[in-house]
From Swiss-Prot:
The gene is calA. GO terms for molecular function: calcium ion binding. Calmodulin mediates the control of a large number of enzymes, ion channels and other proteins by Ca(2+). Among the enzymes to be stimulated by the calmodulin-Ca(2+) complex are a number of protein kinases and phosphatases. Ca(2+) 1 binds at residues 21, 23, 25, 27, 32. This protein has four functional calcium-binding sites. It comes from the Eukaryota. Ca(2+) 4 binds at residues 130, 132, 134, 136, 141. This is Calmodulin. Residues 8-43, 44-79, 81-116, 117-149 form the EF-hand domain.
Length: 149
């Protein structure tokens, strides 16, 4: 995971890490974690912080060493990327930019992708993703659909 980071990112994370490693022992406490991540432009919730700590704090001692920290930051960045990708994909479908994907827009994109769909198939796809029943897909519904694949 951390091997996907550039040298520049690693040295940036090392710098931030050492700012909060007050006693220089190579570990930071879980309480300091939120401050470190925010200094790097991330904005984790308390719940996310707790989950990340639980995932990487192998010995459960409540502190995180630098390799654990790198793994965690790489994960966080990967998740952010996929969010951006979903936003971009939504824009491709939402031709008129009104925040909704209509049946016509869905049919148009699917046809361009080489998928010849009947009206019934398009309506079925809309129905499956259309949580609020308004006959079109909004961004939240699109995200749910993409993440449930």
């Amino acid at each position: 995971m951390a091997d996907q980071l550039s040298e520049e990112q690693i040295s940036e994370f090392k710098e931030a890490f050492s700012l909060f490693d007050k006693d220089g022992d190579g570990t930071i406490t879980t309480k300091e974690l939120g401050t470190v991540m925010r200094s790097l432009g991330q904005n984790p919730t308390e719940g996310e912080l707790q989950d990340m700590i639980n995932e990487v704090d192998a010995d459960g001692n409540g502190t995180i060493d630098f390799p654990e920290f790198l793994t965690m930051m790489a994960r966080k960045m990967r998740d952010t990327d996929s969010e951006e990708e979903i936003k971009e994909a939504f824009k491709v479908f939402d031709k008129d930019g009104n925040g909704y994907i209509s049946a016509a827009e869905l049919r148009h994109v699917m046809t361009n992708l080489g998928e010849k769909l009947t009206d019934t198939e398009v309506d079925e796809m809309i129905r499956e993703a259309d949580v609020d029943g308004d006959g079109q897909i909004n961004y939240d519904e699109f995200v749910k659909m993409m993440l449930s694949k």
